[in-house]
Amino acid sequence: MHTLRLPLKTNKNTEGLFEKRFQLIARIHNQTVKHAKKLLTQLDKSKEYRTLRKEYGELKVKADAGDELAAIQKALVADKMNAFRDSLGLSKNAFDKYVAKMQHKYKKHINSHQAQVEAERVWAGVEKVLFGDGKDVHYKKITEFKTIRGKNHTTGIFFCKDTSDTKCPYFVKWGSIVIPVKMPDTVKADLPDGGNYVLESLKHEIKYCELERLWFKSGWRYYANVYFDGDAPKKLQPGRGTMGIDEGPSTVAAVSEDLAILEELAPKCKDYNKQIARLQRQIDASTRKTNPEKFNEDGTVKKKSEYKGKRWTFSKTCLRKKAIVRELYRRKSEYSTHMHGNIVNRMVKNASMFITEPMDFKALAKRAKETRRQNKATIIKKADRTEQAVYKYKRKKRFGKSVTDRSPAELMIILQRKCNQYELFYYEVDKWEYRASQYDHTTNTYIKTQLSQRFKTVGGNNVQRDLYSAFLLACRWHSKKPSRKKCRELFPHFVKMQNLLIKQMKENGISRPACFGF
C-alpha cells in the first residue's frame, strides 16, 4: 500500500464544514477516552483482578525458568483475566459498540467507519496501558486532530474522477459536498521509464481516502490522502553491494565498497529552535502582561482555583505569534523527514544490502536514573577565597534534545520502507555480541572507548569511530561478529575513502568536533 497526498481547492463554506466535522471527531475521541479511563479505574480497584494479576506475575517467573506446569497455569490465569476485562467492557468490540451510540447523533457528518477508527485509536492506547509500558490514556486538543479516516472506499470520503470535466477531472466527495483537487504536474516524466508518478499511482486500486489538515500561519490547509493498493511507483535504481550503517542520536555513518557517508541529521533544526525560542519568550512576556492576576509574585502560575476560573486573554499579536510557532514546528518536522529521505535515497542508489545495529532511542532520550559524581575533581573558590577540590555530580541529561530534534529513528523507518518497496535486504545484528564500536579487527579484541573519543588507531591508521563501526558492519560474517578476512581485504580501501571524505568535509567547512571529531 502507498499514499498520494493531493491539495484540495476549498472555500469558506467547505472549510467551516470541515472544522465542524473535526470538532465532532474530537468529541467522539475524547468521550471514548473518558469512558476508557473510567473502566481502567474500575479494573485497577478490583480486588479479584489484582489477585489474578499478582498470580500471573508469579507464574510467569516460574514459566520463564522452564516450569511446564506453571506455563499451563499461567495460560489459565490469562484466560480468566481476559474474561474479567471483557465483562467490564475493556475490549475492541465493546469500544466499537460504545462509539456507535455517539456516532448515531452525528450521522449526517461522521459515518460509522470514521467513528470506529477513533475507537481503534483509543483502544490502542488502552492496550499499551494493559499490556505495554503505557501509564494512562490521554485527552487530545482539537488542534491535535489532523486526519479523518475511513476503512474502505465504499463509504465516507471518496476520491473520484470525471473525464467529462477537462478543467478539474479529479475531486473528493464527502456526503453532500464536492471538493475539487489541485492536481500536480502530470506531464513531467519523473520515473526512470519516462512515466509520471501521479498517473502511475492512479492506475492502482484505491483502498480508502482520508482528509488531512496541516497548519500554516494563515490557517488550516486541507489535503486528500489517497491510499492505493500495491507498492508505489519506483523512482530509484537500486545499487549493488553491502552497506553498513552506524547511526547515532544526531549523526549517521554509512560505508559500502565504493561510498562513505558521514552526515549530521537535519543540520538546520537548530535554526528552527532559535526562531521558536525567540517567539516563545515574546509570547510568555505578552501572556504575563495581559494576565497578571494568574501569576504569583515569584513568576509561577497560580492554581486554577485561585483565579476563580477566569479565562486567559491573549492579544492579537500574541495569537499571531502562536500561529507562527505552530507552523515552525510543522516545517521543522517536514524538514527532518525530507533530509532523512535524501540520505536514504543515496544509500539505496549505492547498495542492495543494509546491515545496522539496532538503537533504542527511546531509552537514550530518558534522563539517567542513578546519581553519580564525576571521576575528576574540580577546583572551586569559596567565599573566603580559599580553594577546595570537589567531585561534582554528573549531569543526568542524555540525548533527549538531539533525539527530539533529529528524529534518528525515522531514518531507519524510511530505510526499512524503501527496502520493502524495492525488495532489498535489511538486517540488524545482535548489538550486545557484535559491539562494532569496540572491535579491532587487527588484534581481534574488544576495547571499550569513551564516547568523547571520536578517532582511534587501528593497524597504524587513524580512523573515525563511526565510519569504522559502519565498515565493520559492512563486513558482517554472522549476527555476532564481522569477518576478519573481509576486513583485512577491504580496510586499505576504506582508509582511503575515509581520508578523502574527511578532506572534502573540511574543505566545505563541515565540522562538528563533538560528533565527528573534527
Q: Where are these predicted regions, by residue range?
A:
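Long, compositionally biased intrinsically disordered regions
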Residues: 1-111, 291, 295, 299-303, ...
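Positively charged, helix-rich recognition surfaces that bind polyanionic ligands
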Residues: 3, 220-518
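Generic detection of long, well-ordered alpha-helical segments
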Residues: 15, 19-22, 108, 112-120, ...
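Short, surface-exposed linear segments at secondary-structure transitions and domain or protein termini
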Residues: 16, 186-201, 207, 250, ...
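A generic secondary-structure signal for well-formed alpha-helical elements
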Residues: 29-36, 40, 126, 130-133, ...
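Stable alpha-helical structural segments in soluble proteins, enriched in small hydrophobic residues
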Residues: 32, 117-125, 129, 467-477
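Short alpha-helical "patches" and their helix-cap loops
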Residues: 42-50, 135-144, 484-495
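Acidic carboxylate diad motif detector
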Residues: 56-217, 395, 400-401, 405, ...
